[in-house]
Amino acid sequence: MRRVSLLTIALVAGLSLAPHAQGDGGYRLVPNWPTLPAGMYFGLKDAPPPPAEREAQAAARRATGGQQAAQNNTGGPTNQPGISGLAIDQQDRIYVFNRGPKPVMVFNTAGQMVLAGADQEINGKAINPNWQHSGTVDWEGNVYVIERDAHRIVKLSPKLDKFLMQLGTTGVKGTDATHLDLPSGIAVLKNGNIIVTDGYGNNRVLLYDKAGVLLKQVGKGSGGPNDKGTGPNEWHLPHKLAADAQENLYIIDRENKRVQVFSKDLVYLREIKNEWNPWDIGISRKGTDGFAYIADHLLERVHKMQLSDGKLVSTWGSQGLGPGQFDWVHGVVVDSQGAVYAADTYGQRLQKFVAAAASR
């Protein structure tokens, strides 16, 4: 019930983000974006359910803190259909990590699907789309897919047709260098080093070299009830992350409701806190515009944040199923032109926003 009380307080008080935010964020929804080919869909084919049923489901999730089915290790559905994460490459192609028949779907900025796949067998097991969480694209165009409940991350070729590498051991959780426990996020640096948030089970962040050899761990990572913490270098569900132009890492510490900032070598720099519940962070591939975009689950919003000081300069969105609203906003990326893409998981859709004055 704590989530409900926070929501009520925020609504009554106008949310303490107000001194930091301006208007509706200055962004508008691009209608009818993207265009899905015939027979393709996000999430479940016959969903979403009618609005009244969806609102009842949303109320139940808020009442329980939104955590039901979050650690499904049985092979059954996660009850979280739709889009679980987003990534973007150097050509501004948007990669959708889809809890549906095609685990990865790729779109250009015009909303046309240009590639779909990642449904082949890998190391004796096909990727279960119900278990997907997020992924990324490295600087060579290779795609990393997090199959969270299989405790593994698979690296695929740019066309999604060749298996290249795996982090973690398929179907086996653990706390050592060769195992993961419900991993949640990933970023790849220009030199090929890989950063993984091993979040739901281990509360640790891992640094690997390009070959997948573990170099460093930040966090207790013991896999037990005492591995959480609130201090620097400690975590309560490190969730997703992004890098800026200097390759400083902005890592969502979800249940501590903060962002911890590290150097590319995982040296702690600072934290950013606000009245939010951040789930994802998006920074442009160049990372030079000085802003990040936060997917905030508290009131289902996207915030534009200054990287220099963590100040929120604009915000938009609300809880709901209408255009520009969100029901479980779980992923966000930004392209080189400043367009923002948000994954609406239970809404089973991908929404694109552009600056109000923009025409694209």
Where are these regions (language model features)?
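Surface-exposed loop and turn segments in beta-propeller and other repeat-based domains
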Residues: 31-75, 118-126, 164-178, 213-233, ...
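Short glycine/acidic-enriched loop and turn motifs that connect beta-strands
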Residues: 101-103, 150-152, 201-203, 256-258, ...
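Short loop/turn segments that connect beta-strands within beta-propeller blades
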Residues: 108-112, 157-160, 209-213, 263-267, ...
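Beta-rich, blade/repeat-based domains predominating
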Residues: 41-46, 72-91, 122-142, 172-193, ...
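Bacterial N-terminal signal peptides
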Residues: 8-16
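Blade-level signature of beta-propeller repeat domains, shared across WD40, Kelch, NHL, RCC1
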Residues: 327-360
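Conserved beta-strand positions in repeat-built beta-propeller and related beta-rich domains
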Residues: 94-99, 145-148, 196-199, 249-254, ...
